[in-house]
């Protein structure tokens, strides 16, 4: 059974719970990650969440999101999920937003509540989606996509919308985004990365 790391407001681990039971009307704060994968042309790989997902089914979002297992290093968790969901290998995995946090509520009241460090990476692969996780994929020009997200003219997951607003502040070219200091990760992630 897949487990997620529960957090306090300071980002310290306070326990674990089964992933299958964590998302509900009063979802506890937990540790996650988001990854934005680009190709050599600077295009972002977008994914459509599988229609069977408990949270935001069928919604388009960034390349990959997930939860590190207890004591699992963030890079290993990201590499694992990219392989499981999309059959991708990546290079230059870079921490870019170490303390991103959000809370979002679906129309049915189910809550997502995460401290979710954001990473960027690059690939030469084409995705081979696992249909249990990903309903569709598309490559999108970063500048056009980010402009549409900021203008509110494209439907995208709530976390992706908030992340894009912060990512554009890092610069126009994702290949030149500065690496964040891993010491700025929440304590639970630093412990997991040890």
UniProtKB/Swiss-Prot annotation:
EC number: 5.3.3.2
BP GO terms, sorted: dimethylallyl diphosphate biosynthetic process; isoprenoid biosynthetic process
Top-level taxon: Bacteria
Keywords: Cytoplasm, Isomerase, Isoprene biosynthesis, Magnesium, Manganese, Metal-binding
Location in or out of the cell: Cytoplasm
Catalytic activity: isopentenyl diphosphate = dimethylallyl diphosphate
Alphabetical list of PANTHER family matching this protein: ISOPENTENYL-DIPHOSPHATE DELTA-ISOMERASE
Family classification: Belongs to the IPP isomerase type 1 family.
Protein name as catalogued: Isopentenyl-diphosphate Delta-isomerase
Organism expressing this protein natively: Saccharopolyspora erythraea (strain ATCC 11635 / DSM 40517 / JCM 4748 / NBRC 13426 / NCIMB 8594 / NRRL 2338)
């Amino acid at each position: 059974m897949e487990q997620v790391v529960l957090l306090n407001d300071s980002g310290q681990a306070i326990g674990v719970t089964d992933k299958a039971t964590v998302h509900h009307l009063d979802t506890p704060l937990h540790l996650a990650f988001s990854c934005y994968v680009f190709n050599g042309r600077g295009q972002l790989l977008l994914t459509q969440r599988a229609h069977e997902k408990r949270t935001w089914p069928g919604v388009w979002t960034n390349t990959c999101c997930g939860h590190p297992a207890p004591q699992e290093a963030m890079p290993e968790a990201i590499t694992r999920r990219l392989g499981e969901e999309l059959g991708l290998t990546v290079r230059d995995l870079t921490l870019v937003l170490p303390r991103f946090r959000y809370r979002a509520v679906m129309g049915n009241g189910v809550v997502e509540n995460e401290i979710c460090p954001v990473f960027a990476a690059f690939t030469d692969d084409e995705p081979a989606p696992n249909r249990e996780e990903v309903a569709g994929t598309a490559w999108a020009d970063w500048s056009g996509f980010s402009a549409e997200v900021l203008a509110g003219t494209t439907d995208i997951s709530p976390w992706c919308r908030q992340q894009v607003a912060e990512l554009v502040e890092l610069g126009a070219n994702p290949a030149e985004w500065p690496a964040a200091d891993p010491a700025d990760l929440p304590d639970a992630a630093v412990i997991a990365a040890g």
